[in-house]
């Protein structure tokens, strides 16, 4: 069983502080954010990370039971590929069905307001779309604490780009990826693997420290 190192716990603490800062916002125009729930994989280091992060979040944020479908794994075969053993192919096929199941469980659009569903288009539709982009107390946020391969795959899937490209992306330990899904179905990636809250000295990826690797 892999658990967090002292550096990993420090990274998780800094991530919790950063999320708390984002949730509070700056003023009425930029925040606060309505975070509903924290979800986490069933792996020990993810559960430790979530525990440390949640110490900084409002008590109103729900904690769900760990979900093994969010556990780390090989989410799909990647392109460009390399020669793989039969066991690796089998693990990838198993990982794909599990991680895809988690993606479909958590990534979906909200129902559109009735006022927009009955709209006949034109300027009112444009105004509604513009209103969606503004800070709004009805916007709901979820935090998912999981793993690099899962995050990269789900980002590709959410953006509707080939998921086989997942290995071309890089998400550092305790980085933040921020996706928005509108009721209209539009999806935007506002942050991918952001580590500004960690600083160079505490930035790591898969055993590598810093950026010169």
Q: Model-predicted segments: where are they?
A:
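Phosphate-handling substructures
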Residues: 1-3, 51-137
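Active-site-proximal alpha-helix that buttresses catalytic centers in soluble enzyme cores
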Residues: 1-66, 89, 173
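Catalytic metal-binding/acid-base residues of hydrolase active sites
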Residues: 44, 70-71, 149
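GST superfamily/GST-like fold recognition
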Residues: 148-152, 188
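Internal, well-ordered alpha-helical segments in soluble enzyme and binding-protein domains
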Residues: 11, 46-49, 95-106, 150-151, ...
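Acidic, low-complexity terminal tails and accessory targeting/binding regions
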Residues: 21, 55, 59, 70-88, ...
């Amino acid at each position: 069983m892999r658990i967090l190192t002292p550096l990993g716990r420090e990274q998780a603490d800094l991530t919790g502080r950063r999320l708390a800062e984002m949730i509070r916002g700056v003023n009425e125009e930029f925040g606060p954010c309505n975070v509903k729930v924290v979800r986490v994989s069933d792996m020990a280091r993810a559960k430790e990370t979530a525990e440390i992060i949640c110490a900084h979040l409002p008590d109103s944020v729900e904690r769900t039971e760990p979900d093994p479908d969010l556990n780390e794994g090989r989410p799909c075969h990647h392109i460009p590929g390399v020669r793989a053993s039969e066991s690796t192919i089998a693990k990838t096929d198993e990982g794909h069905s599990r991680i895809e199941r988690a993606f479909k469980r958590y990534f979906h659009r909200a129902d559109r307001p009735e006022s927009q569903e009955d709209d006949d288009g034109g300027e009112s539709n444009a105004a509604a779309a513009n209103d969606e982009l503004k800070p709004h107390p009805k916007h709901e946020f979820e935090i998912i604490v999981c793993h690099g391969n899962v995050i990269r795959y789900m980002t590709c899937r959410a953006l509707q780009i080939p998921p086989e490209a997942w290995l071309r992306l890089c998400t550092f330990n305790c980085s933040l990826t921020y996706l928005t899904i509108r009721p209209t179905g539009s999806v935007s990636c506002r942050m991918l693997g952001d580590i500004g809250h960690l600083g160079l000295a505490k930035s790591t990826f898969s055993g590598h420290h810093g950026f010169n690797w």
